Amino acid sequence: MKLSADLKAFEGRIGHQFREPERLLRAVTHSSLSSVTRSDNQRLEFLGDRVLGLVMAEALLAADRAASEGQLAPRFNALVRKETCAAVAREVALGDVLKLGRSEMMSGGRRKEALLGDALEAVIAAVYLDAGFEAARQLVLRLWGARIAQVERDARDAKTALQEWAQARGLPPPTYEAVDRSGPDHAPIFTVEVRLGNGETDRAAAGTKRVAEQAAARALLARMEARHD
């Protein structure tokens, strides 16, 4: 088959020309558009998640040969989580070439973090099946680029770090509450409040509750650590 102009341009952006173009088409096809004659990208996403994990594990081990498993695990999680995958997907304009059903398209599917992250994992799997592990490894290293070297030495997610801070001071785990929702249905903004057992609170807003919780925890932890330094 012959790829459309937009998919050919996408090949250029990711630096891989598919020997079997059908693999790329499947990788960018969401389940909202799948049919008997058109497969979606869910199985590719499953495989791509594992390929990405192996590439990142190898890269982190090579980057810091003295790090323990306990130090490497949070760095790994920071590099493979959906928010990171979605950010990488945006950098190569993956959303522009996604094949979506009408309802998913109307609800802003091209901008959804989960959908973008899943599709990027599917693309990684498509490259793996098309040209082997080394091609997939080079793709991941190329797309993630400096993120691997710059991942924080202590890359625990903010909610975990805040909970550990609280427990070390005899406080119960922080609580999180969604206190507001604004914006249109296809691009909502959630405001989340985090509260510590000592009465300290902070708020943050983001496009998903998960990201808002992380941002609120990060802000409160920074304030608490600055106050107790």
Curated annotation (Swiss-Prot):
UniProt keywords, alphabetically: Cytoplasm, Endonuclease, Hydrolase, Magnesium, Metal-binding, mRNA processing, Nuclease, RNA-binding, rRNA processing, rRNA-binding, tRNA processing
Catalytic residues (UniProt): D49, E121
Record flagged with keyword Cytoplasm: yes
KW Cytoplasm (keyword) present: yes
Catalytic activity: Endonucleolytic cleavage to 5'-phosphomonoester
Co-factor(s): Mg(2+)
Subcellular localization, as worded in the UniProt entry: Cytoplasm
GO cellular component: cytoplasm
Disulfide bonds: none
Domain DRBM: 157-226
Catalytic EC class: hydrolase
One GO process term, biological-process aspect: mRNA processing
Pfam family, one: dsrm
UniProt xrefs under InterPro entries: dsRBD_dom, RNase_III, RNase_III_dom, RNase_III_sf
EC number: 3.1.26.3
MF GO annotations: double-stranded RNA binding; metal ion binding; ribonuclease III activity; rRNA binding
Family under the similarity heading: Belongs to the ribonuclease III family.
Function in brief: Digests double-stranded RNA. Involved in the processing of primary rRNA transcript to yield the immediate precursors to the large and small rRNAs (23S and 16S). Processes some mRNAs, and tRNAs when they are encoded in the rRNA operon. Processes pre-crRNA and tracrRNA of type II CRISPR loci if present in the organism.
Subunit structure: Homodimer.
Protein name: Ribonuclease 3
Organism: Cereibacter sphaeroides (strain ATCC 17023 / DSM 158 / JCM 6121 / CCUG 31486 / LMG 2827 / NBRC 12203 / NCIMB 8253 / ATH 2.4.1.) (Rhodobacter sphaeroides)
Lineage: Bacteria, Pseudomonadati, Pseudomonadota, Alphaproteobacteria, Rhodobacterales
